[in-house]
């Protein structure tokens, strides 16, 4: 199953658990979100929802984050948002930050809230994606839109979306260096982190990284093992942690900037899931018995905990650790 198809299944499971329909009541509404900017250093700006800081602090679900990196020649945008409305907001914030052209835009994954806005970019802007993201969007955009409309609601700017895929592709396990003029940005594939096409954007000059969805937000949010691969995901997050200097700042997929040490919460959670599920597998427990045992109440606090932990992450870990 492809990563985005797993994502669909996960959101459907969430709707079942919560007893709600996203079409009527989405986690966040693309018609209502208001984006704001925060300067993280000269030429480095994070864009996130106005209520993101409050939602992150109480374990709520915030809208997609974005950002801008500016060099002497032009700028690079991180993630292009769900629809025309949100894309227009981040482009307006970018124009306030610099009169220089938008040379590049990066999609950290194929998820629509990170990439649907590609079609609204200036024609001269070059889109950077992983090869896996390009292949998925080229083959499955119609299915993806149908899912988004069914579960996130009509009239939220999804209907007009057409594919605009990568001009520059990051190969599996590779990276692309982008020269913005006096500033080189690294677009890195550290390995499987949620979708199999996850890209991390690193500006070494400011020591700021954008992670996309592998890091949803600060504690108490948790990783989503949407396509399984617990062991690989844990390994990738450890690589990211080791890569970052101690004073780095991290802009997550759905929240305000955090520090390097804040990644420990996500790494420690996955490590504990691996430890406890492996013990259950070694004792030949069934999946149902494993879910009942591996409750990990010390990691509660995230509004989606009662779905993401017992219904997604523990079953994904059980499947991964049961492989021959």
Predicted regions and their residues:
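Metallo-beta-lactamase
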Residues: 24-32, 38-39, 74-76, 82-84, 133-272, ...
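Acidic/histidine-rich helix-loop elements
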Residues: 47-62, 139, 219-230
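Bacterial N-terminal signal peptides that target proteins for export
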Residues: 1-11
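Conserved beta-strand hairpin/beta-sheet module of binuclear metal-dependent hydrolase folds
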Residues: 39-93, 199-203, 207-213
